[in-house]
Amino acid sequence: MARITAEDCNKIIPDRFRLVVLATRYAKLLNYKVETNHIKKEKLDKPPVIALRRIAAGKVSVAQLEQDLINSLRTRTMIEPLVNQDESEAVEEKFEYLPEVYIGEDYSDLDDQIFIDEHGEDYETDK
């Protein structure tokens, strides 16, 4: 069995990082059986080897593979921009009903709490 090396693929994709990313994507597609037209001798090889061989032979469209990778990494849902600025201000105003106790930053409510230290003994914070 002939060994495929990165130097064989560098003629098609000169950047090694890009080669690894695209070969990985193509190997995953082969593994998920997206492409089922395997040649008989390729059935014995693992998907990464098949992917590297096909990239080195020029049988894979690099541009199509890049576009497929980009599409797979995109988010599926689009976030709609806030149309009206007044709506965001109205949301902020809805929280004005909270008393100051919940908004404070002094953490005084922890002073009378009982905590357990690393030895399993209880102690109070106001001692």
Swiss-Prot record:
SUPFAM superfamilies: RPB6/omega subunit-like (SSF63562)
One MF annotation (Gene Ontology) recorded for this entry: DNA binding
Reaction(s) catalysed by this chain's protein: RNA(n) + a ribonucleoside 5'-triphosphate = RNA(n+1) + diphosphate
InterPro entries (UniProt xref): DNA-dir_RNA_pol_omega, Pol_omega/Rpo6/RPB6, RPB6/omega-like_sf
EC number: 2.7.7.6
Gene Ontology annotations for the cellular component aspect, listed alphabetically: DNA-directed RNA polymerase complex
Keyword line: DNA-directed RNA polymerase, Nucleotidyltransferase, Transcription, Transferase
Cited Pfam families: RNA_pol_Rpb6 (PF01192)
Keyword Nucleotidyltransferase: yes
Family to which the UniProt record says this protein belongs: Belongs to the RNA polymerase subunit omega family.
Name of the protein in its database record: DNA-directed RNA polymerase subunit omega
